């Protein structure tokens, strides 16, 4: 079965056609062109034939713990979660809408980033907030990048020749959005993102975890609206807020050339990353491997492994395709 995979993310739109053996028949990046019309998708696919369309969807809430055939009702449920992932859910919905219009006679399947984390232990998924918040409004740690974390853990186990069931792995998804997962025996037991993709590590334009009182204080002190605070934390913070650029490669380059702001951004990012890896390791009570998923992951790995403790070995870098 040939499947067209559409990944409409917060900063990119990518297409892949997979054959029956999961080999990539073709790959297209539509980040520049966008998906303003169904025709754009049809033209991108060209003469290629496929039997189904798979969609990456960031937030599945409590409704989806696995893939789901997309119906009108499912699409409405996905739309209802947009407030919890404003940078991502709208992009996913646009991709779903355009693809269903372009290929109305094919099955469309939503694969949720939150699904991999849906059975995390209660100690990891539960926030210490009022019971009503948790029961009535579903406030909990959902976690994200689940498709990436699941793949990275599975593929790395294959590469090092060990059974996934026997491994404790910290997977590091380091893109514009960044998160870690503690994967023990193939199961997510902890992760850094939470109710939304804003929690956790320092990211390209997102703040990551901060004192929850900061937004309230800024609303009171600076007179900012809720929307202005959210915009600042989602789009004007992270590396961009510290160094004036959201590109980690540029940050590292500037820092190496003596740029003070870039050096601070690098150090704050690395501090949060090291602390996150330590937390994930503690959640599993040990670790066998750390896996980085990012084009510049080797740069990050070298910085992290330079401070490894006793008994921790560094293996030669191997690319996870």
Locate each region found by the language model.
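Conserved phosphate-binding/catalytic loops in two-lobed NTP-binding clefts
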Residues: 307-321
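Glycine-rich phosphate-binding loop of actin/hexokinase-like ATP-binding domains
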Residues: 119-218
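Short glycine-rich, Thr/Ser-proximal phosphate-binding strand/loop in the N-terminal lobe
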Residues: 3-36, 194
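Phosphate/pyrophosphate-binding loops at sites that engage ATP/ADP/AMP, CoA/4′-phosphopantetheine
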Residues: 40-51, 158-163, 276-288
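Short beta-strand-loop/turn "lid" adjacent to the catalytic site in phosphate-handling enzymes
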Residues: 45-89, 106-109, 115-127
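Glycine-rich phosphate-binding loops at beta-strand->alpha-helix junctions
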Residues: 287-310
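Short glycine-aspartate micro-motif
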Residues: 2-5, 52-54, 109, 169-173
């Amino acid at each position: 079965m040939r499947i067209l995979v559409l990944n409409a993310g917060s900063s990119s739109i990518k297409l892949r056609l997979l054959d029956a053996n999961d080999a990539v028949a073709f790959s297209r990046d539509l980040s520049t062109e966008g998906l303003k019309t169904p025709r754009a998708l049809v033209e991108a696919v060209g003469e290629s034939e496929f039997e189904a369309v798979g969609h990456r969807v960031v937030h599945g809430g409590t409704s989806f713990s696995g893939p789901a055939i997309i119906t009108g009702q499912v699409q409405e449920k996905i739309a209802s979660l947009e407030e919890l992932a404003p940078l991502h859910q709208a992009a996913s919905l646009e991709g779903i809408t355009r693809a269903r219009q372009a290929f109305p006679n094919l099955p469309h399947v939503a694969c949720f980033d939150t699904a991999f984390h849906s059975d995390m232990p209660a100690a990891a998924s539960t926030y210490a907030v009022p019971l009503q918040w948790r029961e009535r409004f579903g406030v909990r740690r959902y976690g994200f990048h689940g498709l990436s974390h699941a793949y990275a853990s599975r593929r790395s186990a294959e590469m090092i020749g060990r059974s996934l069931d026997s491994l404790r792995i910290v997977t590091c998804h380091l893109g514009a959005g960044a998160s870690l997962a503690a994967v023990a025996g193939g199961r997510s037991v902890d992760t850094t993102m939470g109710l939304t993709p804003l929690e956790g590590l320092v990211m390209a334009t997102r703040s990551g975890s901060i004192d929850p009182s900061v937004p309230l204080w800024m609303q009171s002190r600076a007179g900012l609206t809720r929307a202005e605070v959210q915009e600042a934390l989602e789009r004007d913070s992270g590396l961009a807020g510290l160094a004036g650029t959201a590109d980690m490669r540029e940050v590292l380059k500037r820092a190496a050339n003596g740029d003070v702001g870039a050096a601070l951004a690098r150090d704050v990012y690395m501090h949060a990353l090291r602390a996150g890896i330590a937390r994930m390791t503690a959640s599993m009570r040990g670790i066998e491997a750390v896996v980085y998923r990012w084009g510049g992951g080797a740069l990050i790995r070298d910085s992290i492994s330079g401070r490894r403790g006793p008994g921790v070995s560094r293996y030669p870098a191997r690319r996870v395709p």
